Design a protein with these regions (language model features):
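Acetyl-CoA-dependent GNAT
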Residues: 3-98, 103-105, 116-118, 122, ...
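Residue-level marker of alpha-helix boundaries and capping positions
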Residues: 9, 109-110, 133
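C-terminal "cap" of GNAT-fold acetyltransferases
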Residues: 16, 129-132, 136-183
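Active-site acidic-Proline motif in GNAT/NAT acetyltransferases
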Residues: 103-109, 137
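Short coil/turn segments at alpha/beta junctions that flank glycine-rich nucleotide-binding fingerprints
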Residues: 109, 126-129
Length: 183
């Protein structure tokens, strides 16, 4: 009998349910980069600041992957298996994507792609049409994901300085009726 496929929902993180993922992410980043090249933010700052913090939560529903984002959650949330955040810099006209991470046991199941679609929709819902991010150069899987989603290389932004271990990416999000598309 085949194993049931994964089912998950994406909804806002309101407590500490993603903290264990951020600890794992911090450990992974520390193994790749020196402290001065790590630009990590706490889950508390993402829950309390001008930000949107989303989690992918496993559900008990058996069947294909299902993603319910942001509103109308009817399914009970299980373990948080992935997360992503956006910090809003409204005066500067962009949101910074932070802390995309998926539990190692759940990778390869389109969870990161689903989280990115949800966070981009959340950015557009806030009236912001540009998403930016900083990432390290030793993460080829993450870079491939971002590029496949339409992110392009840009110079350092915000408070970031040029760092040979960092790269900076941007995606223009343009509202198009009920959805959005890439410019």
């Amino acid at each position: 009998m085949p194993a049931p496929s994964l089912s998950f929902i994406i909804s806002p993180i309101v407590g500490e349910e993603a903290d264990y993922l951020l600890v794992r992410s911090d450990e992974y980043m520390a193994s790749l980069y020196p402290a001065e090249s790590n630009h990590l933010v706490s889950s508390e700052s993402l829950r309390s600041g001008d930000a949107l913090f989303l989690g992918a939560f496993e559900t008990a529903v058996k069947g294909s992957c299902s993603v319910n984002t942001l509103k109308g959650q009817q399914q009970e949330r299980g373990q948080c298996i992935g997360c992503v955040a956006a910090r809003f810099y409204r005066a500067q006209g962009y949101a910074e994507i932070k802390r995309l991470y998926v539990n190692e046991d759940y990778r390869g199941k389109a969870i990161a792609r689903s989280l990115m679609a949800a966070i981009e929709a959340g950015v557009v819902a806030e009236g912001i049409q540009c998403a930016r991010l900083e990432m390290g150069i030793y993460q080829p899987e993450a870079e491939a994901l971002y590029r496949s989603l339409g992110y392009r290389v840009i110079p350092p932004f915000g408070d970031y300085l040029l760092d040979p271990l960092s790269q900076f990416l941007e995606k223009k999000l343009i509202k198009n009726g009920g959805g959005f598309f890439v410019d």
